[in-house]
């Protein structure tokens, strides 16, 4: 079947990854020892998308866990599902990247890279028909951002025709861990533009807002934030793991979502939003799900989709629901909000429906939008980057690891180009397109 290898890098990547495996294992009824104890053949039908079947009927996640310090690995290993992973797939250094992108990308991370690629190859070789890779990491630290993007380019080099999608946690203004986040994020985005096929931009600020405003949690923990991220990750891959009426896979998603190769940064959303303990006490209708899903409050990136336009979007519904109703609701929402959709891309919303809902819900929906408003997020990082880079603040940490100032300038201009490309397509209209074509023909 179509397998996916999940690589998780750095503290953030591993924490989200570990949580994700808990969610997926629960959906497929795999217990913490790796054995199956479910009652539905659907759970096993495509279990090999994410799991290898080992001897004795054990299921082992196709996960590669990487970090430059042993701490996170220890906590994953001692966590509830720590014994499920293949021990050889834990790869860690001893010294950490110290929030320094250059350490992750050029020095410490590069030394560990060969052993990481060995494990990736081993995982890829045990697949029948490898569909692609998923990478979870944050862009603010050193390991996830620096080493994560290095791994990305190595995978791209070795598996050029496989889809790579990343779940990237972007730094946000309100929730900042380190001063050099803007540097690390800009250098990473520079790499993501070139090497990833699809990037799901998630940021902590939006997750905090969802937790406090929508879920009414008084003090959200990282556990709560990760719960939201995993709901989205699980939703995106549902179609691969369970049968449905309209299926999507990573490649179909990419083909439908990416109108121009550089513009592959999506904002994910999820509905219904529930906190970890209190599952919904009422069943939602398809109409409510659709409404909630397109709501700005449900977006996991801190930018407002109403400030931009949707180039493309995808909605993945889970649960038993009439297809006709889904189609009607999706049509309605596009009809009512037509000004928010790019009019020069007809039928730009893809829908997929999977029959199996997530644990504890009757139905749910995962939303993925390629909206030009995502530029707000990059603009924000870019402004912080410029403010520091003008004064050359903290630069010696990077140049000390052998980096050149030129790289910073390149990364900065690549990110600014991305912002202006989004702006260009936000302003474009169907009529303009025709005029431009005539103009081009005359020039030619």
Curated annotation (Swiss-Prot):
Q: Which GO terms describe its biological process?
A: microtubule cytoskeleton organization; mitotic cell cycle; oocyte maturation; spindle assembly involved in female meiosis
Give me the residues that bind GTP, please. 11, 69, 138, 142-144, 204, 226
So where does Mg(2+) get bound?
Answer: 69
- Which cofactors does it use? Mg(2+)
Q: Read off the InterPro entries from this record.
A: Beta-tubulin_BS, Beta_tubulin, Tub_FtsZ_C, Tubulin, Tubulin/FtsZ-like_C, Tubulin/FtsZ_2-layer-sand-dom, Tubulin/FtsZ_GTPase_sf, Tubulin_C
Report the residue ranges where the short sequence motif MREI motif is annotated in this entry: 1-4
Positions carrying 5-glutamyl polyglutamate? 436
Compositionally biased region (Acidic residues): 429-444
Q: Which subcellular locations apply to this protein?
A: Cytoplasm, Cytoskeleton; Cytoplasm, Cytoskeleton, Spindle
Family, as annotated: Belongs to the tubulin family.
Q: Where is this region: Disordered?
A: 423-444
Entry comment on modification after translation? Some glutamate residues at the C-terminus are polyglycylated, resulting in polyglycine chains on the gamma-carboxyl group. Glycylation is mainly limited to tubulin incorporated into axonemes (cilia and flagella) whereas glutamylation is prevalent in neuronal cells, centrioles, axonemes, and the mitotic spindle. Both modifications can coexist on the same protein on adjacent residues, and lowering polyglycylation levels increases polyglutamylation, and reciprocally. Cilia and flagella glycylation is required for their stability and maintenance. Flagella glycylation controls sperm motility.
Ordered alphabetically, the record's keywords are: Cytoplasm, Cytoskeleton, GTP-binding, Isopeptide bond, Magnesium, Metal-binding, Microtubule, Nucleotide-binding, Phosphoprotein
Q: Which residues form a coiled coil?
A: none
Domain remark text: The MREI motif is common among all beta-tubulin isoforms and may be critical for tubulin autoregulation.
> What is the role of this chain?
Tubulin is the major constituent of microtubules, a cylinder consisting of laterally associated linear protofilaments composed of alpha- and beta-tubulin heterodimers. Microtubules grow by the addition of GTP-tubulin dimers to the microtubule end, where a stabilizing cap forms. Below the cap, tubulin dimers are in GDP-bound state, owing to GTPase activity of alpha-tubulin. Has a key role in meiotic spindle assembly and oocyte maturation.
Q: Which parts of the sequence carry Phosphoserine?
A: 172
State the GO CC annotations.
Answer: cytoplasm; intercellular bridge; meiotic spindle; microtubule; mitotic spindle
- Superkingdom, natural source: Eukaryota
List the Gene Ontology MF annotations in alphabetical order.
GTP binding; GTPase activity; metal ion binding; structural constituent of cytoskeleton
CDD domains, per database record: beta_tubulin
Database matches in Pfam families: Tubulin, Tubulin_C
Q: Which organism is it from?
A: Pan troglodytes (Chimpanzee)
Read off the PROSITE patterns from this record.
TUBULIN (PS00227), TUBULIN_B_AUTOREG (PS00228)
How this chain assembles, per its entry, is: Dimer of alpha and beta chains. A typical microtubule is a hollow water-filled tube with an outer diameter of 25 nm and an inner diameter of 15 nM. Alpha-beta heterodimers associate head-to-tail to form protofilaments running lengthwise along the microtubule wall with the beta-tubulin subunit facing the microtubule plus end conferring a structural polarity. Microtubules usually have 13 protofilaments but different protofilament numbers can be found in some organisms and specialized cells.
Check the record and name the Gene3D superfamilies matching this protein.
Helix hairpin bin, Tubulin/FtsZ, C-terminal domain, Tubulin/FtsZ, GTPase domain
The name on file for this protein is: Tubulin beta-8 chain
């Amino acid at each position: 079947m179509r397998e996916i290898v999940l690589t998780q890098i750095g503290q953030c990547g591993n924490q989200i990854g570990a949580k994700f495996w808990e969610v997926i294992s629960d959906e497929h009824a795999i217990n913490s020892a790796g054995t199956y104890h479910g009652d539905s053949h659907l759970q096993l039908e495509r279990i090999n998308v994410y799991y290898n079947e080992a001897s004795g009927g054990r299921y082992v996640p196709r996960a590669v866990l990487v970090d430059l310090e042993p701490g996170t690995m220890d906590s994953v290993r001692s966590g509830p599902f720590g014994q499920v992973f293949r021990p050889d797939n834990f790869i860690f250094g001893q010294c950490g990247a110290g929030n320094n992108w250059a350490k992750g990308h050029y020095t410490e991370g590069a030394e560990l890279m060969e052993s990481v690629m060995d494990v990736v190859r081993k995982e890829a070789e045990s697949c029948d028909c490898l569909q692609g890779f998923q990478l979870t990491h944050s862009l603010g630290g050193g390991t996830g951002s620096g080493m994560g993007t290095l791994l990305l380019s190595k995978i791209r080099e070795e598996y050029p025709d496989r889809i790579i999608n990343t779940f990237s946690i972007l730094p946000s203004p309100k929730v900042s861990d380190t001063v050099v986040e803007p540097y690390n994020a800009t250098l990473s985005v520079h790499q993501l533009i070139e090497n990833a096929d699809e990037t799901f931009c998630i940021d902590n600020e939006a997750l905090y807002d969802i937790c406090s405003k929508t879920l009414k949690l008084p003090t959200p923990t990282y556990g709560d934030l990760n719960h939201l991220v995993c709901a989205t990750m699980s939703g995106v891959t549902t179609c691969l793991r369970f049968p449905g009426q309209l299926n999507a896979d990573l490649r179909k998603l990419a083909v439908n979502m990416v109108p121009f190769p550089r513009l592959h940064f999506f904002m994910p959303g999820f509905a219904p939003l529930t906190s970890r303990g209190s599952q919904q006490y009422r069943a939602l209708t398809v109409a409510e799900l659709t409404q909630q899903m397109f709501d700005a409050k449900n977006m996991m990136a801190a930018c407002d989709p109403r400030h931009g336009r949707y180039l493309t979007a995808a909605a993945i519904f889970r649960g038993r629901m009439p297809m006709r109703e889904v189609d009607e609701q999706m049509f309605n929402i596009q009809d009512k909000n037509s000004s928010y959709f790019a009019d020069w891309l007809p039928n730009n919303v893809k829908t997929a429906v999977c029959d199996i809902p997530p644990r504890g819900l009757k139905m749910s929906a995962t939303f993925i939008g390629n909206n030009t408003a995502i530029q707000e997020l990059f603009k924000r990082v870019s402004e912080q980057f410029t403010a520091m880079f003008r004064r050359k603040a903290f630069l010696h940490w990077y140049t000390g690891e052998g980096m050149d100032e030129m790289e910073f300038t390149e990364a900065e201009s690549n990110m600014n180009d991305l912002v202006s490309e989004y702006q260009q397509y936000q302003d474009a209209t169907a009529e303009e397109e025709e005029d431009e074509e005539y103009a081009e023909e005359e020039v030619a």
